[in-house]
Amino acid sequence: MADTEVKQEIAHVEGGDGRDSDQEASYEFTPAEEKRIKRRIDRRLVTTCGVMYCISLIDRTNLSSAAIAGMNEDLALVGDRYSILVLLFFITYTLLQPPATIMLRRVGPRPFLAGICFSWGVVMLGHGFVNVWWAMAPLRVLLGAFEAGFFPSCLYLISTWFSRYELHRRYSFFYLIGVLASGFSGVLAYGLMQMDGLSNYRGWRWIFIIEGIITMIIACAGYFTIVDFPDRSVEKSWRFLSERECQWVIRKIAADRGDADIDKFDFRKWAASGLDPKVWGFALIFCFVTTTSYAVAYFLPIILRGMGFSVAASQLLVAPPYVMACIMMMIVSWFGDKYKTKAPILITCSTLTIVGLVLMGFTTSIGSRYFGVFMVAAAANTNLPTIMAYQANNIRGQWKRAFCSATLVGFGGIGGIAGSLVFRTQDSPLYRPGIYATITCNSLVIIIVALLSVHFRRCNKKADQGLMIIEGLEGFRYTI
């Protein structure tokens, strides 16, 4: 599509004439047909990525379930050894994020995503056979290395198939599958613990063995269901969509943000995306949000145990807060896409997270502390797909999108490192230092979002007056 045509269509989309990108791209399909196309993309792309991501979340966070199922005693995880094992995962997970989205383009989504998923399944299986704590250290490093490419690659791939105001719901559904499965991972772990003694293996070993096998099976299935980029789908004439339907998707993306066509990879152009300050603002927000979400994911069974619940109750009570998170996530994503807003959601959820943290750390009633867990799990996890969509709504260009997906999730890895350290065993049962740290993180989210909102509003005003062109495309406006 010519650049002038793209500019004209973007101007229609953002210029206030009442039309959106779907309408601009609707040359040959009825609204009902367009919905059917989107549903097929949702089923094949979003659902597949979501199922694979859910097993990723379970595999990286099942350490806490194994810890209270006997692993700490068998491997002598005294002092800071447990936190070290949690931390080691995030070192490679963070460092290997940047090249992931480049590899995705070069290798292709099907072999790349299915291949790394199968690989970390093998590593997870190996967790069940270690006999000394330090032998698990290299396995955690390998697990982080293989999982590093998955999340940013999924964000990037999904963003190439949907227009800006379709992404929040898709990211939420993608992440919701993972969160829901993660919430019920305690139930799964409790069930696997009942295999204690089978073949002379302790219950915690069966958690790793069975979940590793499940991961490898899902990876094999995913190889046959993952879809390629829309421009490659046209070239390969996949049965997933016809060439005519793929062309409609490409035109829709071009009408929305003018970056449907992929440029030849240029390292300088890719790296130059890092000169945009807002890219690092998005990354910092994601870092601070993930600090809270990972801290809860890794330590919630242990925290509940410290509240006085039994081992079984601590495993089972993990699930309800995550069910609440899923409900809140879908409601908020619908609101965010319909009203084309993200910043107020981020600020509201961060505020709710702070309130929940205060209840967890500064009240004595078990009921109020558990209610605080509900608030923290729901609000913090709702903010994750919101910041993904916030970033995706405010950038343009395929390689910039690839760079930003990697930096976003890379900083999420840094948040994971922080989250693995904030709740320390010696701070039980109130974990005050961890509470202070996560309250600070959410306060910083509010500040950064407020600063970005002021900047975006000023830029939009200048663009309306014809004084600047945002993101190199006339008619483009920032989402606030």
Q: Where do the protein language model's features map onto the residues?
A:
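Conserved MFS/SLC helix-loop-helix module at the cytosolic interface between two early adjacent transmembrane helices
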Residues: 94-134
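Central mid-sequence intracellular linker of multi-pass
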Residues: 164-178, 197-270, 433, 438-439, ...
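Cytosolic juxtamembrane N-terminal segment immediately preceding the first transmembrane helix
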Residues: 2-63, 73
